[in-house]
Amino acid sequence: MGGVAYTTGSDIDDDHKEIHFSLDYIGSIDSARQEEEIQGVLVHEMVHCWQWNGVGTAPGGLIEGIADYVRLKAGLSPPHWKKENTGKWDAGYQHTGYFLEWIEDKWGDGSVRKVNNALKDKEYIEEEFWEELFGKKVEDLWNEYSEDLPKPKPKEKEVEPESVKLEQEILAYVEDDTLKG
């Protein structure tokens, strides 16, 4: 099986779900993080069992982002996750998960639940969806989120140790053609 895990419906009916987890992936997890990572992946996949999907029309990045938002709020995010604003808001997984966390913080408890519930019975139409929930286009929300992210610190100019400076001065002096006879 490629990837980490996936959730699928059952042939019985849509109320029965199956979670498939890659044994190769489990075996590759650092033993110090294995329990937490397995729990995190299972939480993510369990969300897929209960979340709505806009009658099959919601972007995959939003679906995965909701699942990673729940994982994040459960305290099970892996150490390599980063808040970043590169690309589109619906790039998915932690990228969208952190965006949804910002929405929850900015618009109040239950905001992500409102997003999920709005996907229950009607098709996802981006132009309408976010404005109905938050009164703004998703691009405007994404831009606000981007503005709220900490700005990267500018790189400080590396200061050369005094010994390196002295060595460079000596070499320059030795190589100076005017001193050669």
Residue positions per predicted region:
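Auxiliary, metal-adjacent structural segments of Zn-dependent hydrolase domains
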Residues: 1-19
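Structural recognition of the beta-strand scaffold that forms the well-ordered cores
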Residues: 20, 49, 68-70, 101
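Active-site recognition of the HExxH zinc-binding catalytic motif
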Residues: 40-53, 64-68
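Post-HExxH zinc-binding segment in Zn-dependent metallohydrolases
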Residues: 54-98
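Pan-zinc metallopeptidase signature
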Residues: 90-97, 103-181
